[in-house]
């Protein structure tokens, strides 16, 4: 459970501890409060520490006034972009043409080079639809 938003004209949502209670009541997993950050330096240190770690999609930060902002990690951005590349390669687009456009995958160039091989393996196995990025990730990371 990520949030409970009230049905009103002004955005408002339940507090964190109410969220925990509701999640527990219904048997849902609930987001985890990682840290209370007091200032910009602590915020930057938090991002620097966690941004490079794999398998973390991102964080939602909320200030004392209820303003929320979402931060997506490079790991998440890489795999999100890989999904688009996978779909393009599946439909027959040349990987070199994609590389000229999708330079942001440069921090994981092995992934860019592996996608055509993955697509070929899927086709050889008789697959008729584009595989998911989760299937690509499982294949790539194993």
Regions found by a protein language model. Give the residues of each.
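Core nucleotide-handling region used for phosphoryl-transfer chemistry
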Residues: 1-142
């Amino acid at each position: 459970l990520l949030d409970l938003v009230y049905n009103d004209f002004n955005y408002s949502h339940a507090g964190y501890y109410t969220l925990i209670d509701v999640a527990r009541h219904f048997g849902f997993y609930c987001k985890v409060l990682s840290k209370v950050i007091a200032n910009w330096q602590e915020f930057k240190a938090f991002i620097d520490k966690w941004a490079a770690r794999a398998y973390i999609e991102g964080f939602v930060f909320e200030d004392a006034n209820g303003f929320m902002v979402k931060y997506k990690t490079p790991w998440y951005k890489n795999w999100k972009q890989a999904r688009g590349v996978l779909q393009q390669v599946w439909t027959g687009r040349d990987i070199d043409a994609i590389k000229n456009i999708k330079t942001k995958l440069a921090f994981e160039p092995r992934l860019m080079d592996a996608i055509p091989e993955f697509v070929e393996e899927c086709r050889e196995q008789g697959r008729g639809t584009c595989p998911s990025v989760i299937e690509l990730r499982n294949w790539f990371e194993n």
